Swiss-Prot record:
Domain of life: Bacteria
Function summary: Specifically methylates the uridine in position 2552 of 23S rRNA at the 2'-O position of the ribose in the fully assembled 50S ribosomal subunit.
Location in or out of the cell: Cytoplasm
GO cellular component: cytoplasm
Annotated SUPFAM superfamilies: S-adenosyl-L-methionine-dependent methyltransferases
This protein's UniProt keywords: Cytoplasm, Methyltransferase, rRNA processing, S-adenosyl-L-methionine, Transferase
This protein's name: Ribosomal RNA large subunit methyltransferase E
Entry EC no(s): 2.1.1.166
Residues where S-adenosyl-L-methionine binds: 71, 73, 88, 104, 126
HAMAP family associated with the record: RNA_methyltr_E
Record organism: Wolbachia sp. subsp. Brugia malayi (strain TRS)
Amino acid sequence: MLAIKTRVKTAKGRKLSSTRWLHRHLNDQYVQKTNKDSYRSRSAYKLIEIDNKFKLLQAGQKIVDLGASPGGWSQVASQKGVKVVAIDIKPVNTISGVKYIQYDINELETLRERFKDQKFDVILSDMAPESCGLKSLDHIRIMLLCEAALNFAKHFLNYGGKFVVKIFQGESDKDFYNELKKMFKIVKYFKPKSSRSESTEMYLVGLGFISNSFPI
């Protein structure tokens, strides 16, 4: 089947860069698949690729989707028959089989009261800051989110559990990788094909959580 491209004209008042972005977005095969497959975001395909590679999700597991809005990753996970808790400071529309909690993940004491002694098999984080257009600053901001996600994992991840977190490549990602190496038996970088080639976005996957006995 021939792909039909959508042409976008530069509207009055619209910057050329915006027109180029819109053209790329409308002709993105994953955006088109998102509409066809009824996923809430194209990032759903990133989790599908990560899961195919690392076999993260298994029926009956309990997982947490951090920064879940708009819900693409939670959709994918719920289709695997896992029990999903989606956490975000933004509201998320109802997804069948997903329990949504509106919290800031930095409010650990509140979350500890909520979850008590509950632990999870997989913790996912596709969190990213709103881009300011300056790569070095965006990198710093996403690494702060990575640290918040890892701190959550220290409290709530089961021994032997799995952890996935989005990073932007930069001067600090290697330090974060080394931090994960102390806590997981296996740590891998992974860039899904559905991640745009020009993006510095990658994922770090930690397999086999060793212990939460270190200071938290």
